[in-house]
Structure formats: C-alpha cells, structure tokens
From Swiss-Prot:
Organism annotation: Gallus gallus (Chicken)
Name of the protein described by the UniProt record: CCAAT/enhancer-binding protein beta
Bias (Basic and acidic residues): 248-264
InterPro entries assigned to the protein according to its UniProt record, in alphabetical order: bZIP, bZIP_sf, C/EBP, C/EBP_chordates
Annotated compartments: Nucleus
Length: 328
C-alpha cells in the first residue's frame, strides 16, 4: 500500500518567470516500508537542497511541461530519464522534441521493434493459453511463447476473446487435421477459429457472450434430430389415424339387420306417439283455459251492469230521505 505525501513548496520544480505550470503530476508516493527513514532523517523546517528532492528509485514523476509550453521547454536543458525507466520497470518515454504531439511521443517507443524495426505480431491470448509456439520468435529470450512481447499481453490483448477460445479450442483442434482452411494446422489456427466465433455465429448457437460458455461447439445438426423433425413434419400432413377407421360392413338382408331396424322403428314410433299425446294435452288445456276466461269476462260484465244500476237508483232518491236514513 502507498500513501500520499502532503504538498510541499520545496518539492515544486523551479519554473521561468513567464511560465505558468498547469501540471498536476507533482504527487510523490512514498512506500510504507521507507517510513522509518523519515524518522531517522526528519525534514527541515526551511528549504532543502535539490539533491535531497530528486526522485528516488521507489518514486516516479512525469514532467508534462514540455508538452504544455514548447517555448519554455526549448530553453530548459534536456533532463536524463529516471533510473526506473532505464531498468524497464515503468514506461516513461522521454520527449524527443518540444513541438511534437504528446500521444505520438508516448506511443513512439511502443511501436519500435527490438530486432530492427519489425512490428510485433499482435495475436490473441489464446496462443499463450494453448501454448502454440511461433516458428520465428519461439527461441528469443525477450518474447513469450505466444509470439508477442510481454507488454502486449498486458495492454493490447482483450480478455473478451478468452472465453470462446478456451471452451471451443480443444474440440476444434481434434477435428481439424489437414492443412489449409479446413484443417487449420498452422499455429494461428486456434486464433482464427476463436475470432470467427465472434464474427459469424452459425445456426444452432447463440451469439451472446453470456451464453457462449457451452461445452459443445456448434456443428452440423445431428441426423437423428433431422429425422425426428422430418417425421414430426410428416405426421401433420395427413389426418389422424383415428378418423380413418373403416365402417363395419352389414348385410341388409340378414336377420340381425332386420331385427335392429324393427327395434329402431318401434322406438321412433313410440317417441312420435308421446309427442302427439303431449301436443293434444296442451291443446285441450288451452281450450279449457279459454272457456274459463270467457266465463269470467261475462261475470265481470254482469257485475258492472248491476253496479251502474245501483248508482242510478241512489241518484233518484230525494235528499231528506237520504239524510234521515241511518248510516252504516
């Protein structure tokens, strides 16, 4: 673990009067294991010499002032690279000129070949995973068996290509035996196969990376499955077998057929007779109800006439007679 040392005015580099520094890289990290040295050598209250403020082996700092102000950088002498960069621990390329771009100067050392300007072969991590040595660079001390330098493994390789190749690589190597595009016997065969797995997804496999960890690689469909599908498709072409039962052949001149027909006719006659009897009963009841209705209507008319007669009689009586009569 590392802890951040507090800002110190003496730690800031000396800049020209007309220069305004915009860098924020003056953070110096100090290891916890060197904390005892601070107790043995306490810091002075005032300013310290420049020899005490130099960057140690356990520290690193990048000066961005040449990129921010090229005119001020041209006036200052070029500083030697820190010892950590010479040892190969940290990648800190020195500025070649003040007017160059920061990114171009940063990646200048990355693309320089160690063997005479030849660009390294950027292959996938599947080569190192399966251990396919490269014929041209397999015996070089500074190159890994995967045909690319160690800094490429850390920075240039994308870990997305590991899952599909690790699952599908051994099964593909067993199937591919011949040279050329079909066999893939070259040391880059597994790389091409792992890359094609992400470019074109064959039928029967999913293109999603979350489901690409299946143990079996996609291949030709099983003949048993194709036959089952063909049989299933053929079953829907025709009607079900239950509807194709042949009718039982009966001889119309046989005694059994005649007896059956006679029983059927008797049952039909009985049902018809019952229906006729119900119809007759319903008609008879309708006639009875109609006669009762007529009788009641005649009685209502008779009572209405009697009521009208009584009203006329009461109207003809004199008023003193009606007043002397007792009221019920």
């Amino acid at each position: 673990m590392q802890r951040l040392v507090a800002w110190d005015a003496a730690c800031l580099p000396i800049q020209p009067p007309a220069f305004k520094s915009m860098e924020v890289a003056n953070f110096y990290y100090e290891a916890d294991c060197l904390a005892a040295l601070n107790k043995l050598h306490p810091r002075a209250a005032g300013g310290r010499s420049m020899t005490e403020l130099t960057v140690g082996d356990h520290e690193r700092a990048i000066d961005f002032s040449p990129y921010l102000d090229p005119l001020a950088a041209s006036q200052q002498p070029a500083q030697p690279p820190p010892p950590a960069a010479a040892a190969g621990g940290n990648f800190e390329p020195a500025c070649s000129s003040g007017g160059q771009d920061f990114l171009s100067d940063l990646f200048a050392e990355d693309y320089k070949g160690s063997g005479g300007g030849k660009k390294p072969d950027y292959t996938y991590i599947s080569l190192t995973r399966h251990g396919h040595p490269c014929g041209s660079q397999s015996h070089k001390p500074g190159v890994l068996p995967g045909c690319f330098p160690p800094q490429i493994v850390e920075t240039k390789v994308e870990p997305v290509f590991e899952t599909l190749d690790s699952c599908k690589g051994p099964r593909k190597e067993e199937g591919g035996a011949g040279p050329g595009p079909g066999g893939m016997s070259s040391p880059y065969g597994s790389t091409v196969r792992s890359y094609l797995g992400y470019q074109s997804v064959p039928s029967g496999s999913s293109g999603n990376l979350s489901t690409s960890s299946s143990s079996s690689p996609p291949g030709t469909p099983n003949p048993s499955e194709s036959s089952k599908s063909a049989a299933g498709a053929g079953g829907y072409s025709g009607p079900p077998a239950g509807k194709n039962k042949p009718k039982k052949c009966v001889d119309k001149h046989s005694d059994e057929y005649k007896l059956r027909r006679e029983r059927n006719n008797i049952a039909v006659r009985k049902s018809r007779d019952k229906a006729k009897m119900r119809n007759l009963e319903t008609q008879h009841k309708v006639l009875e109800l109609t006669a009762e209705n007529e009788r009641l209507q005649k009685k209502v008319e008779q009572l209405s006439r009697e009521l009208s007669t009584l009203r006329n009689l009461f109207k003809q009586l004199p008023e003193p007679l009606l007043a002397s009569s007792p009221r019920c």
